Amino acid sequence: MALKKKEFNKKLKHFTINFGPQHPAAHGVLRLILELNGEVVQRADPHIGLLHRGTEKLIEAKTYFQALPYFDRLDYVSMMCQEHTYALSVENLLQVSIPRRAQFIRVLFAEITRILNHLLAVGCHAMDVGAMTPFLWAFEEREKLMEFYERVSGARMHASYFRPGGVSQDISVGLVDDIFAFVAQFGQRLDEIEEMLTDNRIWQERLVDIGVVSAQEAIDWGFSGVMLRGSGIRWDLRKNEPYEIYSDLNFQGVVGKTGDCYDRYLARVEEMRQSLSIIYQCLNKMPRGSVKIDDAKISPPSRSEVKQSMESLIHHFKLYTEGVFVPAGETYTATEAPKGEFGVYLVSKGSSRPYRCKIKAPGFSHLQGLNFMACSHMLADVVTIIGTQDIVFGEVDR
């Protein structure tokens, strides 16, 4: 007598695991609840807020000058680009225009910061996938750029160099020469990183057709920066809505085709090359002149003036105790930060402290899209997708 086979109608439950918040590839304090069917991701649920510090509320209790250092500590990889947005928003409320030399210096260091960010993004992305060498090469170059930060502001990371009304101090001739020397050799270092990664079969297998974002999806989810341009949309605030001196500079917009992780990697590498071109133009075209606005109620007098003039001493004291009184109004200012569109919505009631400061961080929008980007991919691909999003939790959690 043949035994009848039993029919099983049981439904297998999906496996749920925690990714992070203490994971080397989480890029900070990301906690992901991953729902897996075998090794295939069915759902990725990001849990944020582990680095929340209440920055927007803290800014309301500070003067406009005292609020500036908070912006260094949001995206702590692209510090001066965040200062840039805040300084521009305060200047918009004050309705002042800064000297042309100060604008050149700002753009120069904004592009140095872009290279700093992209080197870390590409280097860490490579290390997450399994390539250690590009990470070490990237940090070797970042060290040189951080030295430029230190020489101009005294700090390697949290510079507080851009100020409402200009920059804190002028750059020296020796520093300009050293930046020239860096620009001359950095292209070759980029070639070495590309030689290691771009045509590497393993690198391509891990990135091509992974985390594909169509142009419409990128718009619907509010993506910006490389995440938007990688999907084929030409949107760069430096080109489309130029600020400072970007309209006077010649550089190419970088656009991808397929919207996958590999395209976004190529876009970041090419953006570093375009930043080199912008830095070179800034150094060659930079005019002489002041680096601060000539208004003692906005920009503090120099140390030498404070020691010689009682009026300058009074201005200095009043500026740093009471702060600058900004006319009532509101403004939204956005710049093309390395990770995307970084925006500051600033409201003034006519006092020396902001009434409201709302910060728009690009990483927040990008992290929202992680679920649809990771769905139906393997567990190992989640690390690749997080790396290509270039998430930093200082700006996401704020």
Swiss-Prot record:
Catalytic activity of the protein: a ubiquinone + NADH + 5 H(+)(in) = a ubiquinol + NAD(+) + 4 H(+)(out)
GO BP of this protein: mitochondrial electron transport, NADH to ubiquinone
Matching InterPro entries: NADH_Q_OxRdtase_suD (IPR001135), NADH_UbQ_OxRdtase_49kDa_CS (IPR014029), NDH1_su_D/H (IPR022885), NiFe-Hase_large (IPR029014)
UniProt keyword terms in alphabetical order: Electron transport, Mitochondrion, NAD, Oxidoreductase, Respiratory chain, Translocase, Transport, Ubiquinone
GO MF, one example: NADH dehydrogenase (ubiquinone) activity
Superkingdom per UniProt: Eukaryota
EC number: 7.1.1.2
Localization, UniProt: Mitochondrion
Recorded GO CC terms: mitochondrion
HAMAP family for the chain: NDH1_NuoD
Entries under PANTHER family matching the protein: NADH DEHYDROGENASE [UBIQUINONE] IRON-SULFUR PROTEIN 2, MITOCHONDRIAL, NADH-UBIQUINONE OXIDOREDUCTASE 49 KDA SUBUNIT
Function of the protein: Core subunit of the mitochondrial membrane respiratory chain NADH dehydrogenase (Complex I) that is believed to belong to the minimal assembly required for catalysis. Complex I functions in the transfer of electrons from NADH to the respiratory chain. The immediate electron acceptor for the enzyme is believed to be ubiquinone. Component of the iron-sulfur (IP) fragment of the enzyme. Component of the iron-sulfur (IP) fragment of the enzyme.
Family as reported in the entry's similarity comment: Belongs to the complex I 49 kDa subunit family.
Name the record gives this protein: NADH-ubiquinone oxidoreductase 49 kDa subunit
Taxonomic path: Eukaryota, Sar, Stramenopiles, Ochrophyta, PX clade
Gene that this sequence comes from: NAD7
